[in-house]
Amino acid sequence: MTYVLQNVVFPLDRDPDLLPLYVDPETWSTIADEPVRVSSRAQIGNILDRRRARIVAGRRVSFGTYFNAFPASYSQHWTAVRDVRLRIRTTGPATILVYRSTGTGARQRIDTREVDGAAESVFDLVLDQYSDGGWIWFDIVADEKNAVFEGAEWTTEQEPARTGKASIGITTYNKPDYCIW
């Protein structure tokens, strides 16, 4: 059985200040001791709904963001999940590039796929090299025509752990009025 770990989503409202949390964060560099913005590719007008976005011809959009990148290091350390499947649905001519980061923040390309028409691209990823930190994400580059990102999910076949315990501590003694209103 397939279990969804994380859906790729966009902001519910059309607030451009929130967009960098979901797609294409701004990247800054320093040139001649001055900060320079080197990317600003995502535009709120290209978000079609909660799960879909237009990728304008010739443009590149990154999903290496707070809400849409997959926390590989955290998952490797704190869960039993070792195999993750990234499933991406697109329409139109595009190139999908899957990346990972190292514990030092270096970006490494894992895989690349060229797609056209209605396509579903599946990437099987193993969580065994992230003990020092790292994320997994993807970028989409539209070809000579617009493409549409139709949705994506990070999934696993690993059944979720359902065990757990809870403890309740009440810091008062013989004072039920303090606990119940």
Predicted regions and their residues:
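Phosphate-binding glycine-rich loops and their immediate beta-loop-alpha structural context
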Residues: T172
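Beta-strand-enriched, solvent-exposed domains that form extended recognition/catalytic surfaces
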Residues: Y3-A161
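Short, well-formed alpha-helical segments that are part of the catalytic scaffolds
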Residues: K175-W181
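Cell-envelope/extracellular polymer assembly enzymes that use nucleotide-activated donors
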Residues: K165-G169
